[in-house]
Design a protein with these regions (language model features):
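Conserved hydrolase catalytic core segment
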Residues: 76-102
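Active-site glycine-rich loops that stabilize anionic/oxyanionic intermediates
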Residues: 13, 21-24, 83
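Structural cue for short, hydrophobic secondary-structure segments
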Residues: 18-21, 44
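The serine-hydrolase catalytic nucleophile loop
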Residues: 22-33
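Alpha/beta-hydrolase fold catalytic core
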Residues: 1-16, 34-41, 71-76
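Active-site loop signature of alpha/beta-hydrolase-fold enzymes
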Residues: 24-25, 50-53, 87
């Protein structure tokens, strides 16, 4: 995959990566309590072909999506995924366990 994914970040502290579900985008995470961003840096990544993230026709499966998200994510973070985002987070953990802190 060659396209860069869209991401939104806010807050300071240990990194949390937020991955939305199928047919959604980063906006689903904007309703999280502001208090969470006080103690963490939240990075919501839009999956390939969702929201402002472009689709790459070379995408073949979850591992490709996970690689794209790893490229957009902070160096080490706790990943939180909703639905499809959870599957992508699990794939990322299998590909690069040293990049995920939880």
């Amino acid at each position: 995959m060659t396209n860069r994914l869209y991401r939104e970040s806010r807050g300071r502290g240990p990194d949390l990566v937020l991955l939305h579900g199928w047919g959604m985008n980063a906006a689903v995470w904007r309703g999280l309590p502001a208090d969470l961003a006080i103690g963490h840096r939240l990075t919501a990544i839009e999956l390939p072909g969702h929201g402002a993230s472009p689709w790459d026709p070379a995408t073949r499966g979850l591992d490709d999506w996970a690689q794209a998200c790893l490229a957009a994510a902070p160096a080490r973070a706790c990943w939180i995924g909703w639905s499809l985002g959870g599957l992508v987070a699990l794939a990322a953990a299998g590909l690069a366990p040293e990049r995920l802190s939880g």
